[in-house]
Amino acid sequence: MVDNYHSSLDVAKTPIQSDADAQKSEAETEGPSSKSSQIAAGESIADSVRNFLELRQGGIPDDTGVVFDKISAVGSGTGSQDAPTVTSAAQSAFGLLSPLQNRQRKQYSRPILSGFSGTINPGEMLLVLGKPGSGCTTFLKTLSGLWDEYKEIQGELTLGGHPLLDVMKQRPQDILFCAESDDHFPTLTVAETLRFATRARCGPQVSAREIDTMVTQLAKLVGLGNVLNTKVGDAKIRGVSGGERRRVSLAEALATCARLICLDNPTHGLDSSTAVEFMEMMREWTTQSRCVAAMSVYQASDAIVSYFDKVLIINSGRQIYYGPVRDAKAYFEDLGFECLSTTTVADFLNVMSADPDVRRAQENRENQVPRTAEEFERAFSASPIYQEMQKSVQVAKERFQTNPSPLVKTSAFALPIWHQIWYCAGRQFRIVTSDYSLWAVELATIVVQSLVLGTLFRNQQRTTSSLFIFASALFYSVLVPALQSMAEFGNGFAQRPLILKQKRYQISRPIAYALGLVTTDVVWKVAAICYNIPLYFLTGFQRTAGNFFTWFLIIYLEHLALSMFFRSVAIFSPNMHRAVLPVGIFFNMYVLYTGLYVPAPQMQVWLGWLRYLNPLYYAFESVMVNEFRDLSYQCSASDPVPSGLGYNDMAHQVCAVVGSEPGDRLLSGASYIHAQYGFKTSHLWRNVGINAALFVFFALCSGIGMEMLKTPAGQLATVFYKSSPGVTHRRDKIDSETGQDQGNESSEMSAGQSNDALRLQEHQGPDKSHNLAWTNLCLDIKTKEGDQRLLNNLSGSVKSGQLKALMGVSGAGKTTLLNALAGRSTIGNLTGTLALNGQVLPTFFRSRMGYVQQQDIHLPTQTVREALQMTARLRRPESISVADKNAYVEKVIEWLSMEHIADALVGVPGAGLNLEQRKKVSIGVEMASKPEILFLDEPTSGLDGQSAMLIARLLRRLADSGQAILCTIHQPAAELIDQFDKLYLLSRGGNLVYDGSLGTRCHEAIQYFQPRSRPCGPEENPAEYFLAVIGAGSRNDAHMDWASLWNDSEQGKEREKAEESLVPAAEQAPQLEQQSLYSVPFHVQLWVVVQRTWLYYWREPDYVNSKLWMSVGNSLLNSLTHLQSPNTERGAYNRVFSAFMSLIVGPPLGLQVQPRFVTLRDIFVHRERESLTYHWLAFVLSAFIVELPFTFLSSLVYWLLWYFPVGYFNAPSRAGYSFLMYELFGVFATSLAQLCASLMPNIEAAFAANGFFFMFCNTFAGTLSPKPVTPSGWRWFYNISPLFYLGEGVTVDVLQDLPIRCEESEVSIFYAVNGTTCGQYAQDFLKTATGYLLNPASTTECQYCRYRDGQSYFQQYGYEFAHRHRNIGVFICFIAFNFTMVLVMTYLTKTRRH
């Protein structure tokens, strides 16, 4: 039950109009609508809304009104700044050291909204209009109380008579802001998504059956009834269509039943009919629930506008109109503006927010109309409408002051926190089980690792020679979970926007999501038993239930504690690049201070305390105690000193193992681990408790960190510009909301088109005329239900100088057709004929086709000019000089009015160009190639009406210059569709229903449909009419077979004959002259792509800084731990394992490399590969080449801070060898990381695979599992383990010729036979021994040092100094193999047939 406030404000209602509706603009996954998906027969929208509200609320709620008076919003920053580079980052770092410079740092701010006032009465809908960047989103966020994103909010804002801040504190669930982006868990179904939101907002008292009823009813309201059991999906996971995904977002928002609903561009991705249908439903929703709704809508038709009560028009952050919708047009006409008969009221109002030259003044009033935002604001302030609005504000304030309604505090969340955690955990279980790719990789890797390690250490005997093997096996048992936990650290970054959204919706607290993940982990980590069982029993650990389950509990808690720790680090990091640095350093520290490499007694005083922060240390001590405490170990035949013939009396021998007593053949396990590692048997359960406590602590930290998540205000809406000598930027005009430079864009693209004509008069179009024709095009895919046809015998053509619109209802296959024509179809079986100028279309011609995708896919660090220049250099013929190509790019920039952003980085949404600018860049990239044929997939999607019109006029002018263009569109205004020559209209199932001329005001196409259906109304949008009559919309009842009508019509038959004449018979088809698949030679491709990739690295200093600082941190950790290792047995051990620890940094290095490789790969796969921009080999080579300098630099930094402090040899030949090998190791780590990234489907799986392969290589490096004691079945693996050659080379290099002098604690003591000296007694033994006697003249106590020098020490690992130089070549071969496999896997998985 929802409590509400009271308001006596009147409701101004707009008559509800019904219109034909449609589903989304592109829905390859949609099938025909079923009866269950639609509103029940005979049930009106009003009845459906009423039924849901009664289910959800138990009745009609009371009223709530909004009053805002002189509200202003101030944002942080200037809105634009120079792009950071490695150089600028270094300068900034040095600048921070200057106290004076720090004091001079200034906090910049910028106004976004200025002095807005108005009221929204209960049951009213407010339409917010404005050009992108004018402040529409900021206004909605301000109404919604999302003030954290801004530096300051000023003015008075009340809801139900109460200050908004009080409402946010007392009843935040009554306010909702639905963003334009669609953030969902992609592997959940639509029903699961809506059920979670509905359950969370209804509370625990509502039964599951009632929840299901609500979900069904809500899905019907937004037309999702037929896809309830379909995955939501995203850009990578196939699910519902984009329009349906948008409706899922809207349904989720409505499920909250908020009192104030703010929707940011809710019709984005919806076709015109579906958009009207949604607004009709919202009109009923607000009227019946008496809630308040405010929406920004781009490309709003008159039908959509008619549902609103009031409209707010914003121009550059200033309020230029607020009042009734019905009075808005007359108001601006009174100011002197003219609304043409062909212009919709929505476009006329929207253009008031645009630039001066776009607006049309009445004759003889050109100099009297307002031009700037300030002039508009002054004109509105002087108008009667403004005075009436101010009066209504004051009246509302007085009414609330005299008759205030109570503000009853209720819980913001309908579900108690424990219920939220429970439902979040259940949802996470569903996500884990439905997204099998990641957990399948994880499970496979741990099972394989377990089998490898178990068989490698199998059936160890209880002898002293197995002590180190047991310790190594136990170390691996705690290391593998650590690697797995580290690989999972980045899993939550993609969900951050979703978590913030659900917090905003009061669906669930972020801490509930975090603890739900913890609950899932507690159960899912039990799957680690798949790892534990083989390793434990194959190795030969104590086979008792008590020991096994104790061991399992220890590993289990360690895994949980580490997972929570790395997740906490990631949560408190702003992004993945920043998180990699602490994760890599902490991982290295945890492994180093586990207690094996550096036992506690040998830890340096200044760093030994780190072990107390280390879950691995507690786990390793516990598993060692669990295994060793109750056992004794027989002294092995090789361990007694002296040994051999004549040495059979143990009374005069000692087992040369730490912890042994002279004359005793048995070694107590407890004594050994205490003497060697400093472990105490009493610590077993203490450590279990500590790790359990660390798990709880880090879990709470992750929850607290998740609860603290918010969008940082200082990083919003910033445009970065290229910074270089001679480059100046025009930043005189900044978008009030996004902070983006507008320059004189609109003055250069005016509605009068005079400037447009001048700009394009030099555009000659393609060099030749072309006619692309297709006949009998069919596309069939296999589904669970059988074969499904997406395209059904389609025929058509597009000619030079022709602008053809491709439209269709839901599931028509518009994008599928474009992909098929452009040679980009990747699914199903495509049949039919494609011909160019009467000849079979060759593959190489694809590089001459331009394809503007619906998604704007660009490298964020490229400038607009660089993006266009790259395309021109790679896709235009080599015969054209680079200078001419660049000159043509400048013309394209001018044609698209992008001069002011030519040197701006494309960036990402929210930190880069806005949607309109990004769309222009996408078009410009394709125009820069001077294509013969241009395809565009919904280029106006998400743009406001005026921006869409500018794009349409641009296409019109391109067509007039001779360009052949086929363009899909949705939500087209009547004026916009009038720019097109032809219409290619599809119905569901990929059937053609019309292919012909549109005519003036679409007269010809209307004449075809009207005799066969209803007439088109005089004010009706022709585009909406076409979709309506052929059956668009979730409630449309049209059942006519329009495809058959077209095929049987005279126009259809004539068109078919004309198109068949353009396509030759297969046996007679002439071939175009064969040309190279790519426009320029490979070396040119490689050079251009390398330049682009270099700038990608150079302009993201976070990556380089992270790489260098990780090298600094890990090298200092290693060197300070082993600082100036002495020439003792322990010192030799330290030297070996210090070298080995330098290899443990491999997995963290992979965490840095892989995301960048995947980013470059995705851009290549989704855009550049399809257009044959460059060969796939150029992508792989460039990614590897550009990594090398940064890899070499970071390896150099690591080596300098590690090698000399440890105390290794200073001789150039020795130091140089280690330096070379470590540089090669950096290259190897990079190549292995890129190999895993090329092999795996996503970055999370790549992280897991990288850890697995490094684990495998480290296992056979020869230090933890020495080759001489390895079972023969595994010994050959050392020959294929790259780290064995590296470990051998570096180890022998740092130990050869090193004299070893044992300390007192390292000496083995035995007693000489009476009458002999120690030297005499042991002389036969010493002839073959690796050590020496310290006191050969003694006749009693003999002191034996096990190792004489470094070479005698490293022989135990099977290393040989003679292999030193050979290993360089072998290691280089492994690097070459890795890189070759990167090429092979990229070719097999990402290139298809190219």
Swiss-Prot record:
Domain of life: Eukaryota
This protein's pathway: Mycotoxin biosynthesis; patulin biosynthesis
InterPro entries linked: AAA+_ATPase, ABC2_TM, ABC_transporter-like_ATP-bd, ABC_transporter-like_CS, ABCG_PDR_1, ABCG_PDR_2, P-loop_NTPase, PDR_CDR_ABC
Pfam family, one: PDR_CDR
Effect of residue 313 to V: In strain: MD-8
Substitution effect: residue 747 to P: In strain: MD-8
Biotechnology: Patulin was originally used as an antibiotic and specifically trialed to be used against the common cold, but it is no longer used for that purpose since it has been shown to induce immunological, neurological and gastrointestinal effects. Genotoxic effects of patulin with dose-dependent increase in DNA strand breaks in brain, liver and kidneys have been detected in mice. However, more recently, it has been proposed that patulin might also have anti-tumor properties.
Keywords: ATP-binding, Cell membrane, Membrane, Nucleotide-binding, Repeat, Transmembrane, Transmembrane helix, Transport, Vacuole
Gene Ontology CC terms: plasma membrane; vacuolar membrane
UniProt feature coiled coil, ranges: none
Subcellular location: Vacuole membrane; Cell membrane
Membrane topology: Multi-pass membrane protein
Segments of skewed composition (Polar residues): 737-755
Stated family: Belongs to the ABC transporter superfamily. ABCG family. PDR (TC 3.A.1.205) subfamily.
Protein name: ABC transporter patM
Lineage start: Eukaryota, Fungi, Dikarya, Ascomycota, Pezizomycotina
